[in-house]
């Protein structure tokens, strides 16, 4: 384990079992933030969320990530939790974490379908309606980060976009990590001219909580016109959800009132809310309007 903040909870809840728990904390080469060879940044998987949130270069050039890291849990947990662990954490679904023998634990059904589902997904659910709990993953996906993985078969690099697995492909895994593999570091590309990024999180409690609705934006401006865009949602789907419909709605246009209104409608395109979470549609529309308006200003 890295920081262990999620693993220990999973062991306590019976979601995972282990004959032994191995700490990675002694691997100093997996810790720290440094420049890479192309003008970007290399962030070790064991770097704490607090370190990510307050790093001057991240705050200046990768604002969405700094903000997302600062929004995770509480100060105590950010001091212990790591960036790699935040990417690889297990779902927070109360059926999965509870005593229910659901699909993800080898059962026959997702209990969120007919049960309490206020915090479950509105996009990408296919028989399993978890939401991915990470705040940093959407920000990293928006910023086109890559995950470096090492294991028994060697090293490989995976775009954050392709690191997570939808339930329709595999009920039992949240990421593409194989047996014996671990995340060594995350790499951010050099920021391009005109890049502005942000992360906004809506939660039930002001103190700390997981996202009901979250939005990571990375827009490249040429004057007032949006030249390129990556829009990624948290709290919406079993994986960090890239809203390509929203990107199409704003690229090539200035962020005027009409473009923002179109983007707000596009962000929930294809949404299929359950009985108790239709409110998320209004939340995502509101967050999109708020964040695009702020960037336009």
Give short role names for the model-derived ranges:
Residues 1-297:
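C-terminal structural segment of proteins
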């Amino acid at each position: 384990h890295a920081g262990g903040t999620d693993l220990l909870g999973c062991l306590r809840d019976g979601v995972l079992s282990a004959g032994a728990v191995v700490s990675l904390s002694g691997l100093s080469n997996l810790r720290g933030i440094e420049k890479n060879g192309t003008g970007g940044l290399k962030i070790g998987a064991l770097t704490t969320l607090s370190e990510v949130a307050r790093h001057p270069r991240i705050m200046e050039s990768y604002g969405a990530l700094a903000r997302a890291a600062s929004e995770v849990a509480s100060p105590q947990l950010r001091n212990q939790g790591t960036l790699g662990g935040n990417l690889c954490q297990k779902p927070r679904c109360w059926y999965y974490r509870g005593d229910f023998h659901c699909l993800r634990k080898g059962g026959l059904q997702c209990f969120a379908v007919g049960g309490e589902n206020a915090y479950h997904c509105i996009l990408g659910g296919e028989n399993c309606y978890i939401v991915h709990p990470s705040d940093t993953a959407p920000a990293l996906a928006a910023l086109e980060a890559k995950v470096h993985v090492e294991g028994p078969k060697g090293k490989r690099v995976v775009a954050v976009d392709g690191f997570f697995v939808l339930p329709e492909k595999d009920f039992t895994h949240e990421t593409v990590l194989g047996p014996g593999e671990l995340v060594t570091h995350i790499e951010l590309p050099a920021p391009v001219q005109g890049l502005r990024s942000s992360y906004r999180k809506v939660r039930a409690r002001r103190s700390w909580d997981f996202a009901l609705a979250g939005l990571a934006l990375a827009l490249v401006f040429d004057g007032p016109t949006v030249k390129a865009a990556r829009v990624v949602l948290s709290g919406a789907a079993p994986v960090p959800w890239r809203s390509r419909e929203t990107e199409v709605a704003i690229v090539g246009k200035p962020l005027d009132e009409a473009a923002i209104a179109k983007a707000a409608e596009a962000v929930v395109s294809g949404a299929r809310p359950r009985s108790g979470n239709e409110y998320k549609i209004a939340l995502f529309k509101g967050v999109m309007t708020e964040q695009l308006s702020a960037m336009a200003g």
